[in-house]
């Protein structure tokens, strides 16, 4: 709520985010779009507690993250937030199964085995669990990353251009899995993307421009997204 992020001072001041207020509904898939420099990634980093806000508040699972000490914020990120990045960030010496369970192992948490198996089945990795990242294709590695984000049953998943390093067929496959995670597992996902086709997998799109919310679109199609971006001068 009322989130601002300011870099620099005086004449060199840059408002990356300017009094942004937005809510993300539980069990829904939301995309954040906007031109380069509009504040998309900054908003995501502030929401996930990866970057400090200059002003405002962020609440995840009824917890105001600005009030947390570093140790508690780390614990919240580990237990309540899942991350999917453009680069897969898998541990090369661990196999797929170990990579998926890594957030749980770090938190000394066995996790819900039934849930983990459901996640593995949802992203179709049953026959790849003993493979290390070097033995997996890019799409399979990103599926492991999506499963890792889901493994701890987080309150929310933040995905930053998750298909940016993948060809369009593989990218659409990953987005289908993310859509399934929302529809079948009740997951909440917020994704930053610049691609109208990727955004059309979401239930809702929030558009940013110059650090402010410029509009929203519900039940988007790629054509609607393109039209809307033209109107906003993206």
Kindly give the residue locations of the regions a language model identified.
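Conserved beta-strand-loop-alpha-helix hinge in the C-terminal portion
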Residues: 212-234
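ABC family nucleotide-binding domain
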Residues: 1-202, 208
